[in-house]
Swiss-Prot record:
Annotated source species: Bartonella tribocorum (strain CIP 105476 / IBS 506)
Organismal lineage: Bacteria, Pseudomonadati, Pseudomonadota, Alphaproteobacteria, Hyphomicrobiales
Active site: C380, H514, E516
Pathway: Pyrimidine metabolism; CTP biosynthesis via de novo pathway; CTP from UDP: step 2/2
Stated regulation of activity: Allosterically activated by GTP, when glutamine is the substrate; GTP has no effect on the reaction when ammonia is the substrate. The allosteric effector GTP functions by stabilizing the protein conformation that binds the tetrahedral intermediate(s) formed during glutamine hydrolysis. Inhibited by the product CTP, via allosteric rather than competitive inhibition.
Name of the protein: CTP synthase
Length: 542
């Protein structure tokens, strides 16, 4: 039977529950245990697919096409295990399931209430499909005290009784702020947070306390006394230079040992930390550095590009270099001198996005990369704009644009109306719902033999994750290829362009999919490894 670890947060949001859960999972995995991570989000949206990146940050897409919380990206990167649609749930999805059951008559005329019906649905989600795992780590989104989180806290309280306390533990992540005027760390916010948690019937077994400096033993003992937690189970979680330092730091503080102790496990094998030691060594002892310019639309919130940032760093790890990211707002880029902003870059990357705002700035950056022979990687929207740039500036196609922006006589990029998902034909209309209506999840692509991208992958058949509603118009393929822009990858049915490249450019690749979603620190995605390698070569030329 799986053992359950519930991770809650208090005092303030954005403390890093997702990183804490992922780091603990990595430590348990390093001891040989099979671990599953799940995220429970209290918001009423069915999923984050239609939420603004400024509101939610990145939408992380799984192989089976689920649009999920960005924390699932951390889960995958730290454990190497691919998440799926059953690893993330929201209040909106819970209520939708319940209302569908009520309409079918499944409740046999009963009055549908938060307790037991909502809490039972939450418990069903938590406990289903865990037979092959030793530990299931569940992160509860939000902060203790939020009204939206109450049904989730009640559900995990009930599970503590139903599964027995030998199979359930609670970890509470809090903040211990330093007050400069007093010159000391304060325990009171954590005390009140634990009191709030205890008021709903949950007493934490372990306190994971965030702080920007070492916590004195006297303060740890104070937290132990007032929060009713063993002194050894008050674990300091100090700020780290990078998120990949966290597993080693938590192991040093004894988090994994305390978790096993709380479950009464005293015969666990020691963790094999060689992998993490190698990663942290590469991070802190680079043999050089390069600068990558990311020309994006949501640069005001870096969480909108969380997986991209990590994948770029992974490319640096593969090449033993530090990668500095130069963020360029594509909208401002339209008004300013593009040459000055990009002159110091050893590589240029245009990531995914939606809408016309900032698109012209990205097109200017793509033109700069093409003409100056600077390594370029265009992802999703970035590939589409690379095709528009080629159509305008090389093929001289008048009014070349995307139907996403405006009505145009030459739609180089257009709305997809149908595509194959396995053996099933999926269809969409322009006026349909936005939520869940894109080409989502893992799709196969076939690469041309001897193409640059096929050499990077070392194969001609690949499977990558997608999230897009628009696609490069296949009707313009011949015209663009005559100008040197090769469609080096296509969907298996030959209808949807998947990758492009220039034959006369040292490194210029566009992909319709999102390779950043499958990159891991210990297994960098080949595209990012090759892109950073090309940037290293470029740095030697300037």
């Amino acid at each position: 039977m799986a053992r359950y670890v519930f991770i809650t947060g208090g005092v303030v949001s954005s403390l890093g529950k997702g990183i804490a859960a992922a780091a603990l999972a990595a430590l348990l995995q390093a001891r040989g245990y099979r671990v599953r991570l799940r995220k429970l989000d209290p918001y009423l949206n069915v999923d984050p697919g239609t939420m603004s990146p400024y509101q939610h940050g990145e939408v992380f897409v799984t192989d089976d096409g689920a649009e999920t919380d960005l924390d699932l990206g951390h889960y995958e990167r730290f454990t190497g295990r691919s998440a799926n649609s059953q690893d993330n749930i929201t209040t909106g999805r819970i209520y939708r399931n319940i209302i569908e059951r009520e309409r079918r008559g499944d409740y046999l005329g009963a009055t549908v209430q938060v307790i037991p019906h909502v809490t039972d649905e939450i418990k069903r989600f938590i406990t289903t499909g865990n037979e092959e795992f030793d530990f299931v780590l569940c992160e509860i989104g939000g902060t203790v005290g939020d009204i939206e989180a109450m049904p989730f806290l009640e559900a995990i309280r009930q599970l503590g009784n139903e599964l027995s306390r030998q199979n359930v533990i609670y970890i509470h992540l809090t903040l211990m702020p330093f007050i400069p005027s007093a010159g000391e760390l304060k325990t009171k916010p954590t005390q009140h947070s634990v009191k709030e948690l205890q008021s709903v019937g949950i007493s934490p077994d372990i306190l994971l306390v965030r702080a920007d400096r070492s916590i004195p033993e006297t303060e740890r003992c104070k937290l132990s006394l007032f929060c009713n937690v063993r002194a050894n189970a008050v674990i300091q979680a100090l700020d780290m230079p990078t998120i990949y330092d966290v597993p080693m730091a938590y192991h040093k503080e004894g988090l994994d040992s305390e978790v096993l102790c709380a479950f009464g496990i005293d015969s666990a094998p020691p963790p094999q930390m060689d992998l993490w030691e190698d990663i942290t060594h590469r991070i802190h002892h680079p043999e050089g550095e390069v600068t990558i310019a990311v020309v994006g639309k949501y640069t005001g919130l870096k969480d909108a590009y969380k997986s991209l940032i990590e994948a770029i760093a992974h490319g640096g790890l593969a090449n033993k270099v530090k990668v500095n990211i130069e963020w360029i707002d594509s909208q401002l880029f339209e008004k300013e001198n593009s040459v000055l902003a990009l002159q110091k870059a050893h590589g240029i990357l245009v990531p995914g996005a939606f809408g016309a705002r900032g698109a012209e700035g990205k097109i200017r950056a793509i033109q700069f990369a093409r003409e100056r022979k600077i390594p370029f990687l265009g992802i999703c929207f970035g590939m589409q704009l690379a095709c528009i740039e080629a159509a305008r500036n090389i093929a001289q196609i008048e009014n070349a644009s995307s139907s996403e922006f405006c009505e145009t006589e030459n739609p180089i990029v257009g709305l997809m109306t149908e595509w194959l998902k396995g053996d099933v034909l999926e269809k969409r209309t322009r006026n349909g719902d936005l939520g869940g209506s894109m080409r989502l999840g893992a799709f196969a692509a076939e690469l041309k033999e001897e193409s640059h991208i096929a050499k990077i992958y070392g194969m001609t058949k690949i499977v990558e994750r997608h999230r897009h509603r628009y696609e490069v118009n296949i009707d313009y393929k011949d015209k663009l290829e005559q100008c040197g822009l090769i469609f080096s990858g296509m969907s298996p049915d030959g209808v949807l362009p998947e990758t492009i490249e220039y034959v006369d450019h040292p490194w210029f690749i566009g992909v319709q999919y999102h390779p950043e979603l499958k990159s891991r620190p210990f297994d960098p995605h080949p595209l990012f490894s090759s892109f950073i390698e090309a940037a290293v070569e470029q740095s030697r030329l300037v």
